[in-house]
């Protein structure tokens, strides 16, 4: 019988990849849904292109800044917390080396290793890189892979702008009679693509994320279109 396990891809650094993927997909989806819903709602309230363009541009600027700021604050808080934990772990290793070695051995013993094997693993890992060994086993932290908050902020802003560009172009370049429908369809197709790409890169089933994100986007667009149409009709009375 052929063993195909050797063909299965494995990645040691998969967690950072998922973090960047999450931020990128979230930013793009937020840009698509936010700006599409905004311009569709305004277009439902008025046929004048001026307010639609102004609202779209304002939404893009506000949304990209909000995404960047939110990601910067979130990642900075996480990094500060991880840095504090790393500092404390270094101090404990300096003050209580024997106790920390016993703790590391106990961790691997709880994972199923025999006491003698766990002690040997702990000693070898400690000899290789004592700080990295304890950070990984006790806290799940890799000191070399702490996320840069500035990188995260720029990534979120750029991904939001990339997602927001599609509905903005769709609503401004399409004839008046078709712009709402075309923006609606183009946005849902874009959401399906981002959902599918995210699932593929994350090595998860594709159908469920695609259905989930397109259903949510359709609901958001339908609600804002309805509210815009209602407000537009009331204003014209």
Regions found by a protein language model. Name each.
Residues 1-23, 75-157:
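Cytosol/matrix-facing amphipathic helices and coiled-coil assembly/linker segments
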Residues 1-74:
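Internal alpha-helical transmembrane segments
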Residues 16-27, 49-57, 117, 149-154, ...:
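The feature identifies polytopic integral membrane transport proteins across all domains of life
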Residues 27, 31-38, 133-177:
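Structural signal for alpha-helical transmembrane segments and their flanking helix-loop junctions
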Residues 30, 69, 118-122, 160, ...:
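Residue-level signature of catalytic and energy-coupling elements of molecular machines
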Residues 54, 58, 62, 66, ...:
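Alpha-helical transmembrane segments in multi-pass membrane proteins
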Residues 72-76, 142, 195-205:
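C-terminal ends of transmembrane helices
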Residues 225-237:
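Juxtamembrane boundary at the C-terminal end of a transmembrane helix
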């Amino acid at each position: 019988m052929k063993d195909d396990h050797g063909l299965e891809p494995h990645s040691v650094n998969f967690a950072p990849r998922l973090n960047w993927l999450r931020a990128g997909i979230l930013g793009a989806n937020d840009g698509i849904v936010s700006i599409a819903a905004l311009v569709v709602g305004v277009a439902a309230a008025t046929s004048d292109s001026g307010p639609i363009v102004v609202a779209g541009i304002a939404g893009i600027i506000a949304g990209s800044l909000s995404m960047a700021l939110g990601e910067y604050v979130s990642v900075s808080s996480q990094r500060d917390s991880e840095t504090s934990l790393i500092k404390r772990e270094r101090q404990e290793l300096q003050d209580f080396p024997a106790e920390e070695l016993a703790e590391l051995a106990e961790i691997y013993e709880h994972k199923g290793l025999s006491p003698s094997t766990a002690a040997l693993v702990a000693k070898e890992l400690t000899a290789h890189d004592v700080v990295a060994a304890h950070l990984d086993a006790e806290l799940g932290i890799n000191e070399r892979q702490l996320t840069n908050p500035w990188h995260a902020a720029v990534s979120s802003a750029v991904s939001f702008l990339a997602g927001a560009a599609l509905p903005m172009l769709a609503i401004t370049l399409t004839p008046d009679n078709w712009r709402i429908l075309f923006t609606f369809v183009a946005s849902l197709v874009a959401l399906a693509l981002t959902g599918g790409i995210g699932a593929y890169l994350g090595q998860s089933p594709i159908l469920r994320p695609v259905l989930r994100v397109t259903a949510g986007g359709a609901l958001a667009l339908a609600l804002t279109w309805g509210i815009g149409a209602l407000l537009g009709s009331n204003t014209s009375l």
